[in-house]
Amino acid sequence: MSKSFKLHSVFKPAGDQPEAIRKLEEGLENGLAHQTLLGVTGSGKTFTVANVIADLNRPTMILAPNKTLAAQLYGEMKEFFPDNAVEYFVSYYDYYQPEAYVPSSDTFIEKDASVNEHIEQMRLSATKALLERRDVVVVASVSAIYGLGDPDLYLKMMLHLTRGMIIDQRSILRRLSELQYSRNDQVFQRGTFRVRGEVIDIFPAESDEWALRVELFDEEVERLSIFDPLTGQLQHEVPRFTVYPKTHYVTPRERILQAMEEIKVELAERRQVLLANNKLLEEQRLSQRTQFDLEMMNELGYCSGIENYSRYLSGRGPGEAPPTLFDYLPADGLLIVDESHVTIPQIGGMYKGDRSRKETLVEYGFRLPSALDNRPMRFEEFEALAPQTIYVSATPGKYELEKSGGDIIEQVVRPTGLLDPLIEVRPVATQVDDLLSEIRIRAAINERVLVTTLTKRMAEDLTDYLSEHGAKVRYLHSDIDTVERVEIIRDLRLGEFDVLVGINLLREGLDMPEVSLVAILDADKEGFLRSERSLIQTIGRAARNLNGKAILYGDRITASMEKAIGETERRRAKQQAYNEERGIIPQGLNKKIGDILQLGQPSMRGKGKGRGSHKMADTTQYQSLSPKALDQKIRELEAKMYTYAQNLEFEQAAELRDQVHQLRQQFIAIS
């Protein structure tokens, strides 16, 4: 039986949180399909959501707009629910180049990808948790709307083992091969199995800490045990165990054979169409590529780019929605859309971009028309599949407001009593010199400044100018990858520099209590970067500081500025009245830097003899390393580990393997 959610927190709901929690729960229990939580920056929206999840005790999916915010939410939810299943589901590609064709230059680009094994394991763990238990929170990016293996086929492929079961060794090995596990008697790692006499060791694909030992007596399963794959130490016996497939995309052999016949029929029809239109090159290209794929599927059970035949493999009709993570979520599940003003448009935009690329591939004979059905969900399909939904944002979009029927649940008063920033409007003519003097005031009292510009060129020039005049400044732009971005933000918080200049990156999800001033240059240039929503989000970056202030440089007050200033002042007045009424003195937020960056850091694995006690000492010396330096250190330790293994010095190799595992967790956390 599944456990109930148990919320761990030293804090109790305060400010507007108790009322927001009550209204959200009331709405969900009354069957409302859509609700919007308008929570200002720093008001504890995540804590409110965690309380709702704990009280209603329903499996929950939280959608975040990007991997960085998803990791931050995952870390926070892990802290709130340490005894429950908090899972992480984002794209497992470190690098992904989709298959594409450029007709103008007759260039075909092969699919190329690099898969992050740790994230793949976390994805498998997420779907397993959704299938097995109800106390589950899955934090996902918009990767959740992309095709995933059919849950019905996935369930059918599972291998169920029970103590006393009659099954011979060959049958177990054959079933493991069907689940795409590979036999490796030398290197025991995730997704492999090994055989020693009548003992089969299986390393489940969704696990990174324990493995299963199956002990047979003739054709009977005599014992099932969980053990540590590194030390071989038995932990406990289990009466039954379910081995899940190594990948979400496993398909029974009979389904593959049936799909192959259907692909042959479509190929014949498509060839006739191409020949009728005198497209001889395209017809020859399509025949050659598809026949090769069919031969691979017949021999190996899969082929490169097998996802393009997913319609046949999952038994769907033309145009039907692909199975996604939403198909794994129970009907009474709960969906939380974080930063909904960004996430909702993303969901709507994924389908069309994917479709245009694939239409070119089909037109020029690289793929069959059925490849168009290997796609993300359309927005209307997402709406039909989504369970009861709570949209969470400081600036909800038009869609959320319409769906919620205008009944918005506000969370404006912060538990800390902090007020929204004061806003000043100053002229553009002297904006750079005025900004420089403000920076010097903030730097002198050890506070930080965020500056947002309109263009990349302006950001670069401003950074150079400020640097020449003695300011410690860095520039954040779109070419900087996620790992380096996190490193820059951490350095700002640590005081390595005082000013961070950016364009559109200084908005959602940046949690920096040290920032006391936000400067918005050319605030009167109406447009996407200076819309009401963008201005409120950017102003909100100073809302976590006791002396928070926003300066908008503009020679006139635009409609967006007027609305943003009006809304901020309305919130500030409400917060001030609440504080005065209850005698609350605002308190600054002293959030530890490690709290933000050590996202979802697992507890030490070592609980048995000879394990864990020495590792903490070995890895603490690397805690302060930057992501780049940490990556280099991991590579060095891996090289040493393999050297030890080649010299048959397995104890030293095992110790280094444990260190590498711990450092990888640390690297993922700060990425």
UniProtKB/Swiss-Prot annotation:
**CDD domains listed in its UniProt record:** DEXHc_UvrB, SF2_C_UvrB
Q: What is its main location?
A: cytoplasm
Q: Which GO terms describe its biological process?
A: nucleotide-excision repair; SOS response
Q: Which residues are ATP-binding?
A: G39, V40, T41, G42, S43, G44, K45, T46
From the UniProt record, which GO molecular function terms apply?
ATP binding; ATP hydrolysis activity; DNA binding; excinuclease ABC activity; helicase activity
What residue stretches are annotated with the Helicase ATP-binding domain? Answer: 26-183
Where found in the cell? Cytoplasm
Give residue ranges for domain Helicase C-terminal.
431-597
The transmembrane segments are none
Name the residue ranges of motif: Beta-hairpin.
92-115
Q: Which family does it belong to?
A: Belongs to the UvrB family.
HAMAP family (alphabetical):
UvrB (MF_00204)
This protein's domain notes: The beta-hairpin motif is involved in DNA binding.
Protein name from the UniProt record: UvrABC system protein B
Which organism was this protein described from?
Yersinia pseudotuberculosis serotype O:1b (strain IP 31758)
What is the gene called?
A: uvrB
